[in-house]
Design a protein with these regions (language model features):
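Short helix-initiation/N-cap motifs at beta->coil->alpha
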Residues: 59-70, 83-85, 124, 158-174, ...
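A local structural motif
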Residues: 23-27, 49-62, 76-78, 100, ...
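Flexible hinge/capping segments at coil-to-helix
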Residues: 118-133
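N-terminal signal peptide c-region/cleavage motif recognized by signal peptidases
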Residues: 17-19
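Short beta-strand->loop
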Residues: 29-34, 131-141, 153, 161-165, ...
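Pocket-lining segment of extracytoplasmic ligand-binding domains
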Residues: 85-86, 167-171, 175-207
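Short, polar/charged alpha-helical segment
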Residues: 25, 34-60, 90-93, 144-149
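Beta->alpha turn/N-cap motifs
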Residues: 37, 61-65, 81-93, 140, ...
Length: 207
């Protein structure tokens, strides 16, 4: 999902042709590190599409969707790439914010946010999460959206353990938490890097 504080954002994403005058500066923040989903924006920059459209785009890595939304709202960045749950949370908690970001384009057909657990934990369906210990960084989009997932699946009495992003999958692999939230493709690859086979992982997608 793309965020913006000005109508120019639509033109930036659509790569609409602008007059070849002075380059318009655009500061853009990703939701996370330079991973596969960022290719949409990085490849466009590398191929000169933004420049051809009259835009001078600076793309920075992020540290979570929540932070990206807040930085766009504050004016630190003109645009950003963030999960819809983080945007909804910002609107709910800041109804009087003067510069609330708005969504102008959806990148994913469905949110990649999910709960991941090891099969040996006995967790096989959302209801099995009741009473379990979940782990995620406080700014994780999956964690921010978990209350909606929990309500829809009647999950109760969950406790949270917070950690830095590099420790999330490590703590799951060690059994220090029962499950984690995160983007499924990122967490699955991180678990495989920690010698956890894909067939030993249970993924409970949000949608």
């Amino acid at each position: 999902m793309q965020l913006t504080r000005r109508s120019l954002a639509v033109a930036a994403l659509a790569l609409a042709a602008l007059p070849a005058a002075a380059q318009t500066p655009i500061k853009f923040q990703l939701d996370w590190r330079f991973e596969g989903p960022a290719a949409l924006f990085l490849a466009s920059d590398a191929k000169g599409y933004y420049k051809a459209a009259g835009l001078n785009v600076t793309i920075d890595a992020g540290n979570g969707s929540g932070g990206t939304v807040q930085r766009v709202a504050s004016g630190t960045y003109d645009m950003g790439f963030a999960d819809l749950a983080a945007l909804m949370e910002f609107h709910a908690n800041n109804p009087d914010a003067p510069n609330k970001p708005v969504a102008v384009m959806m990148v994913y057909n469905n949110t990649p946010a999910a709960v991941l657990a090891l099969k040996k934990s006995g967790i096989a369906k959302p209801a099995d999460l009741s009473g379990k210990k979940l782990g995620a960084p406080v700014f994780d989009a999956g964690r921010r959206g978990f209350p909606i997932f929990a309500k829809a699946n009647n999950v109760q009495n969950v406790t949270w353990t917070s950690m830095d992003p590099p420790l999330r999958e490590t703590m799951l692999a060690r059994g220090e938490v029962d499950a984690i939230t995160g983007f499924s493709f990122t967490s699955l690859l991180n678990l495989e890097a920690r010698n956890v086979k894909a067939q030993d992982v249970v993924i409970l997608p949000y949608s």
